[in-house]
């Protein structure tokens, strides 16, 4: 967060645009909130999360994945889709959705889950039931590489 204010404050450009990717959804929301709260004249442009052909969220970190680790990393998006499908079939309890996602991720050896969270898509507040748009966010270490991914449900 300090980086964007350090860049903006000394320059004071007349029009300042900044692109932040939706892949790190939490960071994007926090930066948008900071820009609003501090009344910076900055337009934040959300960069769409782009997936590679195999479903892995595009990231420079993917270059560190061996072919074996890349195969394992596919479970992140599969697990997000599983959570979304369960939601679309009527499940609204966050605890059940998270358990299904974790179980799916744990089915692949060599994937160390750091977190699986489902939060309000606008505020990132903790929720017990999904009643409006929410973000499913996951982070895991595959091999030596930390990967993050997310998907929005309820839109």
What function would you assign to each model-found segment?
Residues 100-155:
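Phosphate/ribose-recognition catalytic cores of enzymes acting on nucleotide-derived substrates
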């Amino acid at each position: 967060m300090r980086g964007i204010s350090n860049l903006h404050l000394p320059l004071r450009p007349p029009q300042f645009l900044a692109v932040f990717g939706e892949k790190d959804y939490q960071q994007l929301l926090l930066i948008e909130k900071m820009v609003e709260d501090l009344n910076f004249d900055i337009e934040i442009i959300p960069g769409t999360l782009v997936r590679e052909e195999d479903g892995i969220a595009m990231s420079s970190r993917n270059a560190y994945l061996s072919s074996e680790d890349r195969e394992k990393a596919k479970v992140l998006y599969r697990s997000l889709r599983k959570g979304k499908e369960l939601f679309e079939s009527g499940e609204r309890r966050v605890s059940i959705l998270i358990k299904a996602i974790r179980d799916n991720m744990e089915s692949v050896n060599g994937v160390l889950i750091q977190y699986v969270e489902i939060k309000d898509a606008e505020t990132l507040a903790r929720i017990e039931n999904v009643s409006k748009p929410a973000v499913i966010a996951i982070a895991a270490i595959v091999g030596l590489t930390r990967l993050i991914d997310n998907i929005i449900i309820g839109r």
